[in-house]
């Protein structure tokens, strides 16, 4: 886990230092939930508190790179489901997940937190990452993160976002159970993060003509 953290820091330190003008910083608050052999189909099942921080480098008003550090609780119990198989199995677990992921983010409309107030757009993101799992066992696993949401610029340099993110893992032991043959998750466990993000810029530097090209055309 420590090696992943240091790799994360060194990979993005140059962007943080030299790219302030096009950078957003954010905090996330919401819930985490689990899909797997116990919960095969319920969205937002057994939600547990989750929080995180992220750094976004805006390549363009439609394209960004985003680095997340999120963590949240996970739990599930067969007693929550009304079928005889799960009632007899009586499996359960609780624990946590902490992740570091890099995503490419696409805005459906041009968006910037240093431009017009109430600028808004839906967005989608996908990428790669790793997660530290502590449930039935402790493990570090690769994940493929996907997210979609809606963002709005509520004040100059400040944005608000609502996001649902789901993580495909290559791991089947969140719950300590052998694969359930009919699970839609294809025998690997998944987890999700759902919540609200607040983003901001610490300060504003001189604008970049290439970055502002789309916004200037819209104002003509």
Describe the residue ranges of each PLM region.
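Gram-negative (and chloroplast) outer-membrane scaffold detector with strong preference
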Residues: 61-136, 200-202
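Short glycine/proline- and aromatic-enriched beta-strand/turn motifs that initiate or cap beta-hairpins
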Residues: 19-56, 199-205, 220
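Outer-membrane beta-barrel translocator domains and adjoining extracellular loop/strand segments
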Residues: 37-42, 78-84, 115-117, 135-140, ...
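Transmembrane beta-strands of outer-membrane beta-barrel proteins
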Residues: 23-27, 65-67, 100-102, 120-126, ...
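Predominantly the C-terminal beta-signal and adjacent terminal strand-loop region
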Residues: 78-79, 154-220
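Residues on the lipid-exposed face of transmembrane beta-strands in outer-membrane beta-barrel proteins
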Residues: 27-31, 53-57, 102-106, 126-130, ...
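Repeated loop/turn-to-beta-strand initiation elements of outer-membrane beta-barrel proteins
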Residues: 23, 62-65, 112, 156-160, ...
């Amino acid at each position: 886990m420590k090696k992943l953290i240091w790799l994360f820091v060194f990979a993005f330190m140059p962007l943080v230092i030299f790219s302030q003008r096009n950078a957003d910083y954010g905090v996330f608050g919401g819930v985490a939930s689990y899909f797997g052999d116990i919960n095969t189909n319920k969205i937002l099942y057994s939600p547990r508190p989750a929080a995180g921080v992220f750094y976004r480098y805006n390549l363009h008003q439609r394209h960004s790179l985003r680095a997340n550090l999120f963590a949240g609780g996970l739990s599930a119990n067969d007693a929550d489901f009304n079928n005889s198989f799960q009632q007899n199995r009586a499996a359960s677990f609780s624990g946590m997940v902490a992740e570091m992921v890099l995503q490419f983010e696409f805005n459906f409309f041009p968006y910037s937190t240093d431009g017009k107030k109430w600028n808004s757009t839906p967005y989608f993101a996908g990428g790669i990452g790793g997660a530290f799992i502590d449930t039935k066992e402790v493990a570090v696993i690769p994940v493929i993160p996907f997210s979609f949401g809606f963002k709005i610029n509520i004040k100059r340099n400040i944005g608000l976002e609502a996001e649902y993110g789901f993580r495909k893992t290559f791991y089947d032991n969140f719950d300590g159970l052998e694969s359930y043959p009919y699970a839609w998750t294809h025998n690997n466990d998944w987890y999700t993060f759902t919540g609200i993000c607040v983003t901001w810029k610490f300060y504003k530097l001189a604008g970049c003509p290439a970055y502002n090209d789309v916004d200037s055309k819209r104002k003509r």
